[in-house]
């Protein structure tokens, strides 16, 4: 009798993987719709560009590795990576940026490590950080939500901006970022950080148009609530577990509340942290990546809490206004250590 010995993983269920990935793609629809509503058609165009790039890059690498292209593409993981990167970048970012970032995410951050299940870092966030460090101006050039925008590009001008950098009338990103008050706009978190550095008080900052009549910034609170709806859907479908998003959001809220309590003149409120930036997207769609997150329940709680602390620290004291991507990657580094100390011991073995 011949015994065949194979390396791990010892169980394979591609159908289950593709089902979970498909559920995540479906759950992303409310967030995509909200971002498109408030920031224009560019969100959809970036998603299409990222999806095409992800599929092509994955297919090329699989062909070079002499693996089945069709079966691997049907797990939807490449599409999800492209989607997460596309919704994280400004909707009018140049086309080559999303292509570069997605290609880097798939080829370097995923396939170079061996493909799905082998990568230690979240590929989409690796691609995002590479773009943010390399092209900080373009990666922070978000349009103001349509409610406070002085100029809103139509679908054709959106395409022109992405592929040429100008509208039909010759307008550029500088013009499109002008708000109704005649001042160039930024995201709520970016506005808060840069205004504090300029010596403005929190009370003055909250009078800016980007915060008018909103808990956490015009448009952004609804975008985050839309991603929250998608996250609840994933929990309902048991596609993700509650431990990471709950511990992440509770820790972020606790840190923000304590900071705001002791220094309300210099630190953002809990609602600004929870409902601005990529908070809900990170909580339910990025941190919960089963490949790069902790694999035990206690470990997931620690992993989520660590990410929450890191997001608050980066937003409050770091050089970047959001910090979700950096927090995710830093938390990914700790996963082997977290799993080592939280994995249940084998029955019959003493603690060593």
Curated annotation (Swiss-Prot):
The keyword Cell inner membrane applies. Keywords: Cell inner membrane, Cell membrane, Electron transport, Flavoprotein, FMN, Membrane, Phosphoprotein, Translocase, Transmembrane, Transmembrane helix, Transport. One of its GO terms (biological process) is transmembrane transport. Pfam families: NQR2_RnfD_RnfE. The modification FMN phosphoryl threonine is found at residue 187. Belongs to the NqrB/RnfD family. This is Ion-translocating oxidoreductase complex subunit D.
């Amino acid at each position: 009798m011949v015994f065949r010995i194979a390396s791990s993983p010892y169980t394979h269920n591609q159908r289950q993987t593709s089902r979970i990935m498909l559920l995540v793609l479906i759950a992303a629809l409310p967030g995509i719709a909200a971002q498109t509503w408030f920031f224009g058609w560019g969100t959809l165009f970036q998603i299409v560009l990222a999806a095409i790039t992800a599929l092509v890059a994955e297919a090329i690498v699989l062909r070079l590795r002499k693996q089945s292209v069709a079966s691997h593409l049907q797990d939807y993981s490449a599409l999800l990576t492209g989607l997460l990167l596309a919704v994280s970048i400004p909707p009018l970012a140049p086309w080559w940026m999303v292509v570069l970032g997605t290609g880097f995410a798939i080829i370097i951050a995923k396939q170079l490590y061996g493909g799905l299940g082998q990568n230690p870092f979240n590929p989409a966030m690796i691609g995002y950080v590479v773009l943010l460090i390399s092209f900080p101006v373009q990666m922070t050039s978000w349009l103001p939500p349509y409610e406070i925008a002085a100029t809103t590009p139509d679908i054709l001008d959106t395409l022109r901006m992405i592929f040429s950098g100008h509208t039909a009338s010759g307008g550029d990103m500088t013009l499109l970022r002008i708000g109704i008050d005649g001042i160039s706009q930024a995201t709520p978190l970016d506005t808060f950080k840069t205004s504090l550095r300029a010596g403005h008080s929190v009370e003055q900052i909250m009078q800016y148009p980007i915060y008018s009549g909103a808990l956490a910034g015009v448009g952004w609170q609804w975008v985050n609530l839309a991603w929250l709806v998608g996250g609840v859907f994933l929990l309902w479908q048991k596609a993700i577990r509650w431990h990471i998003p709950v511990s992440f959001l509770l820790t972020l809220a606790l840190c923000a509340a304590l900071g705001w309590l002791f220094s309300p003149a210099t630190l953002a409120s809990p609602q600004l942290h929870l409902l601005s930036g990529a908070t809900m997207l990170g909580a339910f769609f990025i941190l919960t990546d089963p490949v790069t997150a902790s694999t035990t329940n206690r470990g997931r709680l620690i992993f989520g809490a660590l990410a929450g602390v890191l997001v608050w620290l980066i937003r409050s004291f770091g050089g970047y206004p959001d910090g979700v991507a950096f927090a995710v990657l830093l938390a990914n580094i700790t996963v082997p250590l977290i799993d080592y100390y939280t994995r249940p011991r084998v029955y019959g073995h003493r603690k060593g």
